[in-house]
Regions:
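C-terminal peripheral helix-coil segments that are non-catalytic and often amphipathic
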Residues: 1-3, 98, 102, 132-145, ...
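Amphipathic alpha-helical linker/stalk segments
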Residues: 2-5, 61-91, 132-138
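Helix-turn-helix
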Residues: 13-16, 20, 24-58, 62
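Conserved hydrophobic residue
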Residues: 30-31, 119, 148
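Hydrophobic alpha-helical connector segments
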Residues: 62, 76-105, 153-160, 187-190
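All-alpha amphipathic helical-bundle segments outside canonical DNA-binding/catalytic cores
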Residues: 87, 122-127, 143-161
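Amphipathic alpha-helical segments used for helix-helix packing
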Residues: 88, 100-122, 170-177
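Short alpha-helical scaffolding segments that buttress acidic/His motifs in well-ordered protein cores
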Residues: 93-96, 109-113, 160, 164, ...
Length: 205
């Protein structure tokens, strides 16, 4: 029976498999990823992967669940220390940019979920639903108080998501073309998004 022992750094075998699968799904795509290739890259037998994750579909579900949990923790952490109103929106955008810089494969997975559609995308959205629900309630309260312009909260969240992910996707495209964005350019892009969102949302300076 395979053990959970992994690398000398203490990373368990299941965690290593999930890391490798995430990287491959994010860069190569789900269909182009094979368990044989993952096993070869990890220097384990294919049966070891299948012991922990009985099929490629189960592996994808596990990657989605872990990635959604990591995203939720990062966003919840930024919100826990943020103030009210616009400051909370700004905190989320900054958190997403930091996460994309540290773990670009998460951004790649989000794009891949959009391409795959249901049931993978549905599972990812469902995992984030508690966070989305709280965000919708926050936006509704800000609109009711007159601090933000009136929009349908969930449609507004979708627009914010599309704007931020679109900008980050452009950054990843530049990397793919061999042009590594500088810290200054990333800060400038983040500032541009924040200015755009603030002008579209905030009614009170």
């Amino acid at each position: 029976m395979p053990t959970t022992n992994g690398k000398a750094d203490g990373t368990s075998t299941p965690a290593r498999i999930l890391d490798a699968a995430l990287a491959s799904f994010a860069t190569r795509g789900y269909e182009a990823t094979s368990l044989d290739a993952l096993a070869a890259g990890l220097e384990v037998r294919k049966q070891t992967i299948l012991y922990w994750f009985p099929s490629k579909e189960v592996l994808l579900d596990a990657v989605i669940d872990r990635s959604a949990a990591e995203l939720s923790v990062a966003l919840e952490g930024s919100l826990a220390t943020a103030g009210p109103g616009w400051v909370r929106v700004e905190a989320v955008v900054r958190s997403v940019f930091r996460l994309a810089a540290r773990q670009p494969e998460l951004l790649g997975l989000v794009r891949e979920m959009g391409r795959l559609g249901p049931p993978a995308a549905t599972r990812f959205v469902a995992a984030l639903e508690p966070l989305v629900g709280r965000a919708s309630e926050f936006l509704e309260a800000e609109m009711d108080s007159g601090h933000m312009r009136r929009h349908e909260p969930r449609l507004l969240l979708l627009a914010i998501y599309s704007t931020v992910i679109g900008m980050l996707t452009e950054v990843e495209l530049l990397r793919a073309l061999g042009e590594e964005p500088t810290t200054r350019s990333l800060v400038r892009r983040r500032a541009e998004i924040l200015d755009l969102l603030r002008s579209a949302l905030v009614t009170v300076p």
